[in-house]
Amino acid sequence: DKRGIQSVIMEPLLGGRLANVPVHIADRLKERGPQNSIASWAFRFAGTHEGVLCVLSGMTYMEHLVDNLKSFSPLKPLTEEDLVFLEETATLMQDYPTIPCTDCQYCMPCPYGIDIPTIFKHYNKCVNEGDIAQSIESESYKKARRAYLVSYDRAVPKLRQASRCIGCGQCTHHCPQHIRIPQELHKIDRYVENLKKNTL
């Protein structure tokens, strides 16, 4: 702003993470703006700031294009109240233990055949949908346990699961999000083993 140079915003959705949020966060956003998509909040946040020339958005489907056009044509800037609301929402999101993977796949291929992005994507999806078991004593434990284990085996073949990680760290150097990948894989593997043994 000081130098009068305009900005171009890349990855306004953090690789899709801001469009795929936990259920209680999505409900909160929908309650405030029933007509707005989840993604539109991030687009409007990026576009509201002065000095933004362009917001770049990767689109896979026609509905993404339609939603982007609706968000920016015309852009409805966020109010001060909206910005406070989003700041509070961001704080709530930080309390959820998702892994900040954007599925860029720079960590691939793993020399041991581990499907790192899919493992993280599956874990984040379960967190967002409330299918992470906290304790064997919780009411939802059996449902969450079954949901995680069954969907994990469907999403990731056995020979590509987190249990295969030896902690070589080759993947870590390539991650633009600076995720400590071996540690996260070991955390997921421990969680899976605890579910299998009912020792949470």
Identify the function of each model-found stretch:
Residues 1-200:
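Structured C-terminal cap/extension of enzyme domains
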